[in-house]
Every structure is written in structure tokens, then in C-alpha cells.
Amino acid sequence: MRAALVTTVLAAAVFVAAGSAAADVGPARIARAVRSAEQSRSLWATVNICDTRKYRNDLGVRGQMPTLGFAASMFMVVQVDFWSQAQHRFLPIQSNLATTRLSLGTNASGLQQDGAVFPFSAHTGLLNATVTFIWTRGGKVIGQTVRRTTAGHTDAAHSSPPRYSAAQCRIT
């Protein structure tokens, strides 16, 4: 009986502590956490698949985003862009097939990665992607930032070949 009472008291203490920790997430803490995540070197987007034998005429885009130190839902919106010879810059491909929204779940710690593979026809040309990283809490956006794909992220999961990371992809 005494053991059951001690267990109940400990469980109640843990519940109260968890509730007060959640209550400590005020606007100032949220702003600091979002600013830190936005400036983090762990926040990136990369091309991890580019027209390989296994992924013929495919573009793979992967992103990584840090958590905020408290529970927040995390999303990435991936928009594939093409090189415009006329405008000498990358422009968004105007098709629902070139945009996807990825949910990375609700997390409080660590780094989260996800990605998407986009099929194209041969001779599409030079592509990259713009990724919008979004943190929400209670259904409201608390942070959002944008990155273009860059090279050098050899820890990108599911790369083909392994450790492949590039800023752009040419579909030939």
C-alpha cells in the first residue's frame, strides 16, 4: 500500500513538473528559440538525388531542421525551381507536381530530416529547390524561414549515391 502511495505521489509530481515546464514557454522563449533555429548551421536544404541510374530523371530534395527545445510541430514546403535562360535566375515551376508539404511531426529535441523525390522528363534542364521551414505551436505559426538547396550536407539521409549533396541538378 505504501509503495502504491509513493508511486502515485511521484507520478503526480512528474505531471505537475511537466505542466509547469510547458507553461514556461512564453513569447520571449519562443522568439529566442526560433531565432536560434533560423541561424543554425543544422538548418539546410540539399539536392540528395540527381538523375541517377536508380532514379532516372528524378530530383531528390532533402531538408533538415532543428527543434526548438520545447514541443512544436515542424513542416517543410519544398518548391522545385528551374533555371530561366531568359531571366538568368531560378524561377518556381508552376505546377502542383513541383511542390510538396512535408510534416516532420511534433518534436522537442534533436534534428529532424525529411525529403521528397520529384520525377521529370528527360532534358528538363537545371533545377534546384526552395524549402520553407515552418514551426507551429497550438496550430499557429511561430517561426518560418526559407533556404535554397546547397551542397555539402553529406549527412543527408537516403542520398543516391550515399553522401551525395548538391545545390543544383541537371536532368539530361
Question: Which residues does each PLM region occupy?
Answer:
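Solvent-exposed serine/threonine-rich low-complexity stretches and specific carbohydrate-binding patches
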Residues: F90-N107
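Contiguous beta-strand segments within globular domains
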Residues: D51-M65
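Short coil-to-beta strand junction motifs in C2/discoidin
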Residues: A72-V78
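Hydrophobic/tyrosine-rich beta-strand signature of extracellular beta-sandwich/beta-rich modules
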Residues: V80, A129-F133
